[in-house]
Amino acid sequence: MAHNHWCNLFSVALVCVVALVMVQYSVAQNSPQDYVDAHNAARSAVNVGPVTWDESVAAFARQYAQSRAGDCRLVHSGDPRYGENLAFGSGFELTGRNAVDMWVAERNDYNPNTNTCAPGKVCGHYTQVVWRNSVRIGCARVRCNNGAWFITCNYSPPGNYAGQRPY
């Protein structure tokens, strides 16, 4: 009987530790510093200076993300004060780091010599991440009513101006 009691206590403790690690991992992939670090790694790779977290930009991102929680549609805010990258994930837990990594993966479709995307490809998320003049960011992540994840990163000043190079 005592053996079963200790086994049950051990099992409960193990479940709690695993749950704590999972929560910690999830939080660790969504902190302001995680967003900043992911952006700055991409920027550093092309010799662009770092971004910093801006709480006023982040407040806008949070407000906009909350407004999308009802339908989780990838619709841009249209606010001219900010550049904006959006991400959506369903069927898995999309983290902020995942979103930035998806945007940065578009670098393979960007030709810096011609300042164009490969035919039929998208690369504007990547160019916003590395846009030299966009030096302040704020990002937010929400769980939508349908269970999917919506992430926005906003950039100040905005980038992706037609005919201009990101770096």
Curated annotation (Swiss-Prot):
Residues 1-29 form the signal peptide. The keyword Kinase does not apply. One of its GO terms (cellular component) is extracellular region. Disulfide bonds join 72-144, 117-123, 139-153. CDD domains: CAP_PR-1. Residues 36-155 form the SCP domain. InterPro entries: Allrgn_V5/Tpx1_CS (IPR018244), CAP_dom (IPR014044), CAP_sf (IPR035940), CRISP-related (IPR001283). Keywords: Disulfide bond, Pathogenesis-related protein, Plant defense, Signal. Belongs to the CRISP family. This is Pathogenesis-related protein PR-1 type. It comes from Sambucus nigra.
